[in-house]
């Protein structure tokens, strides 16, 4: 069983905590957030809570050791715990979507002494969408490409996942259409226009628990890898290669 600490306890973090708590492969040991937990509120899932802004993270880990960290906080928090990841060789799955070039380079450096995965969208389906779209783009580069992203109306910025799709497909950001409607958790669609046909690749997160199942998938697969910096694509490609090298199973007549 892998002991896990969860950093970040917003709406997504809360959903992730519920999934990890129920997965028999993991033991969710604690939750960390930037500010102290309100004293008049019950602890999340009965777990201890660490305030990143006020305590010593190394001392916290000494008292509450874990094997892995899952980060659903913000782009700056990695600098508060990164050296402990390096020193203790902790597995890190980060779903932060807006790392600066400096912070992303720092995350890559942690991969020299630990297993580190960074993915702006941690859902399995979205990452399979990106991989599939990249493959089709490589097969048929002449096709027109457009990206549609839909999210809840309170989300102000362009989706980090949409930006990643655009970068992967070598599309300008003006080829991204953003819609903000009601309570949509997240929908991404890549549309390829051919002269006589259209291909649409779509993924929709119905509940935020999809982030939790994606993080659990990443943790399970990352634990099998050597130290290094990984993307979700790396994990998927490893599994696809394994599938392609397996003998084809034929149904007997």
Task: Write out the residue ranges for each language-model feature.
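Structural motif
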Residues: 7, 72-73, 95, 119
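Hydrophobic beta-strand scaffold residues
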Residues: 28, 49, 92-93, 116-118
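Rossmann-fold dehydrogenase core element
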Residues: 91, 106-123, 140-144
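Short, acidic/turn-prone active-site loops that include or flank metal/cofactor-
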Residues: 55-56, 97-101, 121-122
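Rossmann-like NAD(P)H-binding beta-loop-alpha module
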Residues: 128-142
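Rossmann-fold NAD(P) dinucleotide-binding segment
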Residues: 58-68, 72-94, 106
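C-terminal substrate-binding/catalytic lobe of Rossmann-fold NAD(P)-dependent oxidoreductases
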Residues: 3, 7, 11-60, 141-253
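Rossmann-fold NAD(P)-binding glycine/threonine-rich loop
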Residues: 76, 81, 96-116, 127, ...
